[in-house]
A protein has these predicted regions:
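Beta-propeller and closely related beta-pinwheel folds
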Residues: 62-75, 110-118, 147-280, 284-320, ...
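Proline-rich low-complexity regions
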Residues: 139, 154-161, 423, 427
Length: 543
């Protein structure tokens, strides 16, 4: 009689093996589709990692300033203000205060704001002024040294947001249910056109606006403004803003959607078009020169029982989501299921955005965890180097400002960044038959630390507790590796092997195999190029 032990020993001694390839997930993750029919270039999860040449861990964050803006509060506004020839300030709002950084400490701009109100901050470069608005208080203007309330005849009493357009300053005023008006001239202190004279009331309420044009400019024939409404999205445009519209030539076009946006911090210009998070928890892209928003967030909308995506954003927290276009990605930060702070990010690779054969857009990467971001700000003006700044969303941590994605920073303020990739479920030839795991080979940059490796079938983990020790042959810094022996060339690419069967410590049988590779370090990150799995086919069907 042949026992199961005899069968396993026979497997150990078998010579017939098959090699299965696992490429890096260039198509990103897919939480929406059938887990069995995912593309080999898709992944179930890419936590804290993304594809750029190889699959690499994200960089970490450091505090911009060790002192809180306001003790034990969250950040509710952040902006980089450029003015004059080469002047710049970081403007921040927390609790009741608007403050700026002097270069060594936080200093007050205004201390009488309504506590905790999300603030939209905009620069009008032509006047060297920045405008801070929250929809409750009079808007505050700041020129780098002195502050004042927004003023003028018919001035908005409770501005939600301002936006320079053509030679005017547009404003959404909460006093009139979020309707729009604008300055009557090239000034913010003179006369303002009345809302009734402007006649721009496309929705029951407007929440925010951004420029919508391929060159991200408020001038030019194609320059338009995307308005976020309660019940839809709208495009405002015109070269002559004299009122009424029969005198000027401005107009409002409603887009082909009944879904609005109440999360103005998620509205972003990208080279592909304007993006935003809708009130239905879907991410939309409005390509330039079209009137039809495309839903592009399906792949981060989970239909799997063990993973969550944007579908679990609490209804009361949609308005607090935020996003930024940075380093080729649309980076979306939001609160997870049952949470009140933004703890999760997903990144859409705009440089490689594509619709797949199922009609879904990607590549998306994430979840990115370990950072609690309430609002982002790019530092991409004169004298800056494209730094990505962020405000703290969790008041129990404190009102800190961080620099994210910092070169050479491999931790989040000293906390290791947990990176892992879980691949698609490879059918290993015939998914009706079982295979025995024999050996795994990884092609990667040989930095330092330890990789944890697990093998999963669709019903759970089959083999866990495996480790691969990296040799420290390459030192990572930013986007560059240096070998230990020669700091002038890239670090070494290595092949690392893990034996499971055939003398490697046991045999595991499965029908489909998803690799889960994890890494965590405060001094390094990983960069993986390919994985190959050697299995021994069995003549064992399902039972």
């Amino acid at each position: 009689m042949v026992t199961r032990l005899d069968s396993l020993r026979a497997i150990e001694g078998a010579d017939s093996t098959v090699i299965h390839n696992y490429s890096v997930p260039r198509r990103g993750i897919n939480l929406y589709g059938n887990v069995i029919t995912m593309s080999p270039e898709e992944a179930i999860q890419t936590q804290n990692c993304f594809v750029r040449a190889g699959l690499k861990g994200r960089m970490g964050q450091t505090k911009f300033e060790e002192t809180e803006v306001v003790a034990d509060k969250k950040i509710v506004g952040l902006h980089r203000f450029y003015y004059g020839a080469d002047n710049k300030q970081l403007i921040v709002v927390s609790d009741t205060k608007i403050r700026y950084h002097t270069g060594s400490a936080w200093a007050d701009i205004d201390t009488g704001q309504t506590a905790g109100k999300n603030s939209l901050i905009t620069t009008w470069g032509a006047l060297d002024k920045v405008f801070i608005c929250n929809g409750t208080d009079p808007g505050v203007t700041w020129n780098g040294s002195s502050a004042a309330d927004m003023s003028g005849t018919n001035a908005p009493a409770k501005p939600i947001q301002v936006l320079p357009y053509r030679d005017r300053l547009l404003v959404i005023d909460a006093t009139n249910h979020g309707d729009m008006q604008w300055s009557a001239s090239f000034s913010d202190t003179g006369k303002w056109e009345t809302i009734s004279a402007c006649g721009v009331r496309p929705d029951s309420k407007l929440y925010g606006m951004i420029l919508h044009t391929d060159n991200n400019s408020n001038q030019g024939v194609e320059a338009k403004v995307l308005l976020a409404g309660a019940n839809g999205m709208h495009l405002f445009s015109g070269a002559d803003l004299r009122t009424p519209s029969t005198t000027g030539d401005y107009r409002v076009e409603s887009l082909a959607t009944s879904v609005g946006c109440n999360a103005p911090w998620t509205m972003c210009w990208t080279p592909a078009g304007s993006m935003y998070l809708g009130r239905d928890r879907q991410v939309y892209l409005l390509p330039f020169k079209t009137n039809t928003p495309l839903p592009v967030g399906h792949k981060i909308t989970s239909r799997h029982p063990f993973y969550t995506g944007i579908e679990k954003i609490p209804a009361t927290q949609i308005e607090n989501a935020c996003a930024i276009y940075h380093d080729g990605f649309y980076k979306l930060s939001f609160a997870g299921d049952g949470q009140t702070t933004n703890t999760i990010q997903f990144w859409l690779d705009i440089n490689h955005i594509k619709q797949d054969e199922s009609g879904l857009y990607g590549p998306w990467y994430g979840p990115m965890v370990g950072q609690t971001v309430s609002v982002f700000a790019n530092q991409n003006g004169p004298g800056d180097l494209g730094e990505l700044m962020a405000g703290e969303s969790d008041p129990t941590i404190g009102s800190f400002i961080y620099q994210l994605d910092k070169e050479g920073e491999f931790s989040d303020d000293g906390t290791s960044i947990p990176v892992y990739w879980q691949s698609f479920y490879n059918p290993l030839g015939d998914a009706n038959l079982k295979d025995a795991i024999h050996m795994l080979e990884l092609e990667l940059l040989d930095t330092s630390g330890t990789l944890d490796v697990e093998f999963h079938d669709i019903d759970g983990a089959v083999n866990t507790g495996n480790t691969i020790t990296l040799g420290g042959g390459g030192l990572y810094y930013g986007d560059t590796y240096w070998g230990e022996a020669d700091w002038g060339v890239s670090g070494s690419i290595a092949r690392k092997k893990l034996n499971i069967g055939k003398g490697g410590g046991g045999t595991s049988l499965l029908r489909r195999c998803s690799l889960k590779i994890s890494y965590g370090s405060t001094t390094e990150t990983m960069e993986l190029y390919n994985a190959s799995l050697k299995t021994i086919p069995q003549n064992i069907g399902f039972d």
